[in-house]
Amino acid sequence: MNLNFHGLNFYSKQPQKIFEFYKLLGFRVVQEKESDDYFGAALALTDEKEPVMWIWSIPEGKEQPCCNNLYFTTNGQVYEIYENIKSAGIQCPEPFKTFLGGTELILTDPDGYTILFI
């Protein structure tokens, strides 16, 4: 069986804010639907051949269904990513050295979920 990962769903009580945040991080907008009860938008996680992230609204009275934590490898460019995030106007803690000697950057999105860059 040959399966390919196509994307993931993000659910948020503030989907437009999440959408704008990830656009500021540099995610390419694949599709943006006019606001409705569901709010549908798709952002490319990397390039046009890679997976997408769909952003959906959590219906009134419902809880966040799951965790939305992302993990990215930077090919040794953690500090460059950090500078790009800062220049986009996003508050971001500085990268740090791990006990194994690598460098990591942990960012939190407006819903409080973790984005880890290594």
Predicted regions located by residue number:
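Core segments of cupin and vicinal oxygen chelate
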Residues: N2, N9-P51
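Vicinal oxygen chelate
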Residues: M1, N4-K13, E32-K33, A41-A42, E60-I118
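Short, flexible, glycine/charge-rich loop motifs used to bind or transfer phosphoryl groups or to couple energy/partner
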Residues: P59-G61, E94-P95
